Amino acid sequence: MTEELVQRIRERMDYYQPMVETDEQLDIQYQGLINRIVKRYHAENEVVTQFPVHFRLLSPYDKIVYRLVEELATTAVKYASGGTISLKIDVHDDAIFIISENDCLQTEKSLGYGLKNMFNKISVLGGQMQIFENNKRFRVEITLPIDKELCYENFVN
């Protein structure tokens, strides 16, 4: 009981301020986040990740992508119908690309609160999010432009 309570407190703290270690590589941080989500939901799915090796993102994009990975992994783990969940991040000079894909049960064409909130946040940042559901496969594609001025402003603050 105590261990479960401690875990829930850590998760709530992480919700308000992500557990992002400044000296730890993002691929390792994001993989740790996914592992915690899989453990929390007692998922038996295999989560295959493709992240650039030892990549870095300027602030605030490191935390923004952390939140996107958190929501995508949580959605996939909770609603996947089994099989493999794949999560890919690709970073270019001017944009971040994220793709999540998993098997799913046939569902109604509605977004849950998590995906709706994620869509709204991405839109505010000038990005795009597309959702595809075909042959019992659920795929989310995100394109998030990197605004260098936002990075500089965050650095100055």
Segment roles from a protein language model:
Residues 3, 7, 18-43:
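Short beta-to-alpha transition helix within the HATPase_c
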Residues 44-69:
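Conserved short strand/loop->alpha-helix "switch" segment adjacent to the catalytic nucleotide/phosphoryl-transfer site
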Residues 62-84:
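Conserved ATP-binding N-box helix of the HATPase_c
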Residues 84-94, 132-135:
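Short beta-strand/loop element within the Bergerat-fold HATPase_c
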Residues 96-105:
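Conserved DxG motif in ATP/Mg2+-binding regions
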Residues 108-139:
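ATP phosphate-binding glycine-rich loop and adjacent ATP-lid/helix-beta elements
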Residues 138-148:
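Short C-terminal beta-strand
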Residues 147-157:
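C-terminal end segment of the histidine kinase catalytic
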